[in-house]
Amino acid sequence: MLGFLGPNGAGKSTSMKMITGYLRPTSGTALINGIDICLEPLRAQQSMGYLPEGAPAWPDMTPRQFLDFVTRIRGLDKAAARSAAHRAIDMTELHGVLDQPIDTLSKGFRRRVGLAQAIVHDPDILIMDEPTDGLDPNQKHQVRAAIREMARTKAIIISTHILEEVDAICTRAMIIDRGRVIVEGT
């Protein structure tokens, strides 16, 4: 599990957008499971889950409706979608808020809805931008535990400007500043 560290404005979120194919780099590329993200972004994105900094969600939908929508656009049949949504809900502990409109949820629960959409299709690769941003201490502990559990079977990259976050859950770290790698290691 790689922790992508750097101060605010270092280029972490921009780099994450390029790795996931949502922003085309001016030069270079990234290979996702051997697939060039610049040449075949949709194919590469099939094997990854992405939690952007401001996780997309329709505010008038409930978490249940949103996850149903995400499983449909991911092409899961009804039985697989139900099972996938149940697994994502369990992992993100959303049971108590499933039928509340997303715009009424706390920032922490909205963040968990974003995480649930990133993992609902059980991707091989998980890329998360500030995954514990806005979470209270208990929620941070729960989400960190879930991330550690997922890291047993997935390649994971998280970005943060908080060293404690990387220290708590990552096995490797990369520090960038102004879009350039400063140091990398364990």
Please tell me what each predicted stretch does.
Residues M1-D177, I182-V183:
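ABC transporter nucleotide-binding domains
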